[in-house]
């Protein structure tokens, strides 16, 4: 499965549009990581725990997108966009990761 942020697949032609393909993942952020993040925020630097959660959530949502596109009969997804949105409020550190794209058949 080819997944691209562009609206085409280099060297290939879109022969059929299958429709919108999506994926969603809600990732929880650990309280211990929050403490580490607060300390790092005071002194500067990267927060590896959060970065790892984001990387994992992105990988999961792309897998979901690929599976849904395959169910539609597509062999590629173009125009892909990934969004990260905090949800929960009141200290409930959760992250909604969504991905959308157009499922297509390319040759």
Per-range role (PLM):
Residues 1-33, 71-75, 86-107:
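N-terminal presequence-like segments and the immediate start of the first folded domain
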Residues 21, 34-81:
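Short, well-ordered alpha-helical segments
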